[in-house]
């Protein structure tokens, strides 16, 4: 017997046995997997965005940059006692290479994530989903703790890059685990939609979370909180480890996933990957540039309102996830149309952003942008799992590594490209480019209409081929009337009889060395005699 648990007044061993029994049920396992993966994705995106309000000010406070003073002039005044007071006024402080160093610090996580993802997908396909996820979450715990305690730019850059290494394992294995546990199409779409909602929530709640805690308790506190949540989530993964889930195939051999390079060659997967990149380019372009544009075009906007401009669009994003899941259930063969509408909607909304003149007006196109992103992500991520199921091997590590690479490409190079475009051509040109690229890529998704029809035709073709092969086999062709044996009837005969318990053929009958049921003929049968 264990100890008595206070409040609920129950023995600890009984509670442990009840919890184990509850976890052994498949539906409860699925719920736990979804909660664990959603928390992991929430943490990863919070770590990506929480530094936005903290690090620029922190690097200035620790005197990380060389400083020059520009535009100052002396102003002299005489006090009543005859003392002259000289002040420098009218200038500004220039922090040398600030944008460059901030850009590398922001992009280092996504850049390393791009390079690690091919290896993480390969490892996940070989060893399963749970252990790589634990590795990724533990790496995120250590890297975030280092980031919390680091006091120099070099240490912060190292910790930030290490976060990308952990995210490459945690994100990919999390999405693959959902696809592996939720095998039914509608169920998988709903689960991935919930995970995507947590991704969006992490991106939107992280800046206010970091800003408030940084102002109240200093830099280490928000990062230490996130690091210990990472550790707790890694411990929770041990509850859902199922080492026997990915076993062997019908021949007793371990199932091997399709190599990533071969998945890249699949035109349907390549089309989905491109759409995921285009969907996230808008956010990757707008997030680092819209604040500066608002300060120029809407100078009377309070600073706190600029910081929470992305919070209202979170609700349309959740609504988009819900609508997409419902539409996929009603129109399962029109996934491509939902994604096409979302991409076009996103581009048109970006085109309208530069023409807004108030915060309330700006919220409307941003809401449509997030709604369109929800349509694209929620429809295409389940399709990646479906493509692997129908065209490759049902091992999901590499295909969701491709999805993670798509996100990382957008967020690694998006801020750099957007900054260059805004500097040379302006913010309006940036949004026109987003509109043009999204609307141009949207018709490409029309190629995905063949995904489900290909699956149907392939199944019919396989059945017809099996029927033809069995029709030409010697099982039923010796009586002059070839008998077609379908794959189902042949499999059913194998299930009912084993090779050792076949019906014994009399000695005077003609026997054939074949494992399937044979026709029996009377003694003296001559197949070449036309009398027979």
From Swiss-Prot:
Biological process (GO) annotations?
acetylcholine transport; chemical synaptic transmission; nematode larval development; regulation of locomotion; regulation of muscle contraction; regulation of nematode pharyngeal pumping; regulation of neurotransmitter secretion; synaptic transmission, cholinergic
Q: Which InterPro entries match?
A: MFS, MFS_dom, MFS_trans_sf, MFS_Vesicular_Transporter, Multidrug-R
Membrane topology label: Multi-pass membrane protein
Which residue positions carry a glycan here? 74, 81
Ranges in a coiled coil: none
Which pairs of positions does the record mark as disulfide bonds? none
GO CC: one term?
plasma membrane
Tissue specificity comment: Detected in most regions of the nervous system including the nerve ring, the ventral and dorsal nerve cords, and the pharyngeal nervous system. Expressed in most cholinergic neurons. In addition, expressed in SIA, SIB and SMB sublateral motor neurons.
Cytoplasmic-side positions: 1-31, 122-130, 181-191, 243-266, 329-335, 389-393, 441-532
- Describe the inactivation phenotype: Newly hatched animals are small and coiled, do not grow or feed, can barely move and die within a few days.
Quote the annotated effect of residue 347 to A. In e245; severely uncoordinated
| Entry-linked Pfam families | MFS_1
Q: Which family does it belong to?
A: Belongs to the major facilitator superfamily. Vesicular transporter family.
What does the record give as the function of this protein?
Answer: Involved in acetylcholine transport into synaptic vesicles.
Annotated protein name in UniProt: Vesicular acetylcholine transporter unc-17
């Amino acid at each position: 017997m264990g100890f008595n648990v206070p409040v609920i007044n129950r023995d600890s061993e009984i509670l442990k046995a009840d919890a184990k029994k509850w976890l052994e049920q498949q539906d409860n396992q699925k719920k736990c997997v979804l909660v664990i993966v959603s928390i992991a994705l929430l943490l990863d995106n919070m770590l990506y965005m929480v530094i936005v309000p903290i690090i620029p000010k922190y690097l200035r406070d620790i005197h990380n940059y060389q400083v020059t003073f520009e535009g100052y002039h002396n102003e002299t005044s005489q006090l009543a006692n005859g003392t002259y007071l000289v002040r420098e006024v009218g200038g500004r402080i220039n922090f040398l290479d600030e944008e460059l160093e901030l850009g590398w610090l922001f992009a280092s996580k996504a850049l390393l994530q791009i390079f690690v993802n091919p290896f993480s997908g390969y490892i996940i396909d070989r060893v399963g989903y749970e252990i790589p996820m634990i590795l990724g979450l533990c790496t995120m715990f250590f890297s975030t703790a280092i980031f919390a305690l680091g006091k120099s730019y070099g240490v912060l850059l190292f910790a930030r890059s290490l976060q990308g290494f952990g995210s490459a394992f945690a994100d990919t294995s999390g999405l693959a685990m959902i696809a592996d546990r939720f095998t039914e199409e509608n169920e998988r779409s709903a689960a991935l939609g919930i995970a995507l909602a947590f991704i969006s929530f992490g991106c939107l709640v992280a800046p206010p979370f970091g800003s408030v805690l940084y102002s109240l308790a200093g830099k280490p506190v928000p990062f230490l909180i996130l690091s210990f949540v990472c550790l707790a989530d890694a411990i929770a993964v041990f509850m859902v480890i199922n080492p026997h889930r990915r076993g062997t195939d019908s021949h007793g051999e371990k199932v091997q996933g399709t190599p990533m390079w071969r998945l890249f060659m699949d035109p349907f997967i390549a089309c989905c990957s491109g759409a995921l990149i285009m969907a996230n380019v808008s956010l990757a372009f707008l997030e680092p540039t819209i604040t500066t544009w608002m300060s120029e075009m809407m100078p009377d906007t309070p600073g706190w309102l600029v910081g929470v401009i992305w919070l209202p669009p979170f609700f349309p994003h959740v609504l988009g996830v819900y609508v997409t899941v419902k539409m996929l259930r009603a129109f399962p063969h029109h996934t491509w149309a939902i994604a096409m509408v979302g991409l076009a909607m996103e581009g048109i909304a970006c085109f309208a952003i530069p023409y807004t003149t108030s915060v309330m007006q700006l919220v409307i196109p941003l809401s449509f942008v997030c709604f369109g992103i929800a349509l694209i992500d929620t429809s295409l991520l389940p399709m990646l799992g479906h493509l692997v199921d129908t065209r490759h091997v049902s091992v999901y590590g590499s295909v969701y590594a491709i999805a993670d690479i798509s996100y990382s490409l957008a967020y690694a190079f998006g801020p750099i490209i957007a900054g260059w475009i805004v500097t040379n051509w302006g913010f309006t040109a940036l949004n026109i480019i987003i509109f043009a690229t999204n609307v141009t890529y949207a018709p490409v998704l029309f190629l995905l209409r063949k995904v489900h029809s290909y699956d149907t035709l392939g199944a019919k073709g396989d059945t017809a081929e099996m029927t033809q092969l069995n029709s030409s086999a010697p099982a039923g062709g010796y009586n002059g009337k070839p008998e077609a044996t379908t794959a189902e009837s042949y499999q059913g005969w194998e299930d009912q009889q084993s090779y050792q318990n076949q019906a014994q053929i009399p000695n005077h009958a003609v026997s054939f060395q074949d494992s399937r049921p044979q026709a029996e003929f009377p003694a003296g049968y001559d197949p070449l005699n036309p009398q027979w």
